């Protein structure tokens, strides 16, 4: 199996690559690509870690080589958020980066599972879909927006609030991957009851957790380490599923639902990517209202991505 990370020299890319080097199954190839000249050094650095995962670095002229034969491609490339910016401010820069990388994926490994990490995910996944359609290789079962960070944050915050081990807490998070489009289903957390005030404050904190990190880093970056962990978790789940294990993860995929063209759902993963999009269950009144009020914004984010490629 071969996994490629595009944008491997950045904050998320390096954290993600480290976790994959230490956790991918023995015999996996890990291809690290970046336009930054440091990327061969990142690969050499990681190659000194004693695991049976072969790491190779590829510079800006070697994208095709990095992608050829890849089974999974992860894209964290792009510029990070700075204080005062929201994820939509990133669109102007990151949209073009994602478009170019996805075009190369279409040309060199069209069968690969493609995992989009670059923000704004609500929009960049739509860009990826349209770019793949334009090349005639779109398979909706193989395109994922990585929203796992919202899930691990929700599990951490609930665990901390109730003094539980977050590793044993399961919080469904549906919708999109920015602001109010992030919808944690706290009514479905097993064995834990919340007051209305707790639901409101937890929901707001989960939705604004990215900003919490950006502000805490005081201009020094965004959520790179936790995002690296979230992306690694999703990638490793996908690897396990491709090897025949039964795995469910929440991820932003194309759906046939009335909610939006793309929506984060619980998804059963398998050898060919999406095996089955599972229902997200019954919503509380609070969650139903929150969902209804954010759908227009989410649909607008998606439309922006579709129009970016087609206009």
From Swiss-Prot:
Substrate binds at residues 81, 87, 119, 153. The keyword Oxidoreductase applies. The active site is at residue 177. GO terms for cellular component: cytoplasm. Keywords: NAD, Oxidoreductase, Tricarboxylic acid cycle. InterPro entries: L-lactate/malate_DH, Lactate/malate_DH_C, Lactate/malate_DH_N, Lactate_DH/Glyco_Ohase_4_C, Malate_DH_AS, Malate_DH_type1, Malate_DH_type1_bac, NAD(P)-bd_dom_sf. The keyword Cytoplasm does not apply. PROSITE patterns: MDH. It is an enzyme of class 1 (oxidoreductase). It holds the Pfam family Ldh_1_N. It catalyses: (S)-malate + NAD(+) = oxaloacetate + NADH + H(+). One of its GO terms (molecular function) is L-malate dehydrogenase (NAD+) activity. It comes from the Bacteria. Its EC number is 1.1.1.37. One of its GO terms (biological process) is malate metabolic process. NAD(+) binds at residues 7-13, 34, 94, 117-119, 227. Gene3D superfamilies: Lactate dehydrogenase/glycoside hydrolase, family 4, C-terminal, NAD(P)-binding Rossmann-like Domain. Belongs to the LDH/MDH superfamily. MDH type 1 family. Catalyzes the reversible oxidation of malate to oxaloacetate. Homodimer. This is Malate dehydrogenase. It comes from Pseudoalteromonas atlantica (strain T6c / ATCC BAA-1087).
